[in-house]
Amino acid sequence: FQKDPQVLIAHEDVKRFEDMKGKTIFIGAASHRTFWPWLKSKYGLTDAQVRPYTFNIQPFIGDKNSVMQGFLTSEPFSLQKAGVKTNVLMFSDYGYPAYNATISCMEKTVQEREKVVAAFVRASMEGWKSYLANPAPGNELIKKANQNMTDEQLAYSVGKLKELEMITGGDAKRDGIGTIREERLKASYDLMVESKVIDPAKVDFKSTFTTRIIRDIKVLP
């Protein structure tokens, strides 16, 4: 994803991240190592505000003084269906540098089976291109895997992916779906160092990524 779909969802009185000071904020455990340090540093939010997010919208609905994390393609739709008026703030609109849904692989695998890794990456990018052009076959498989998924939810999600060009926008227009840039990765790395999520003495930036494989694939939207 060139545009990270992660968001914070607030009740309609909240217009900015700064307005969330003093609110209860529901976030998942993994978020403490990703976007939460960035939000704390940039907007003055605190750990004292945090409560566990259980992927259930009811605690948010029941507490008008609360905020919850979500994906732009998911929770806002559920809240809309429940008749709850909200404001949705998307991190990528405010300078959060991270990509989303990256492909991770052991360094040894890349070194010893690069052709296999490249084929997997190409198939993944071609899959996204095919899905966005014609979501119907993919949606049938999604509904088989998740009996609670509806056509309406899927249509909403695909609509948001296309409207905001989350996968096909930005550098992907020129360099292909799934492209990554060293400068943007460095911004994410620096953020993690600043937040003490990683120790630069133990994790060398250059060892954390390669642009070689995706650069040669170039599946244009």
For the regions a protein language model found, what residue spans apply to each?
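Secondary-structure end/capping motifs
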Residues: E112-I198
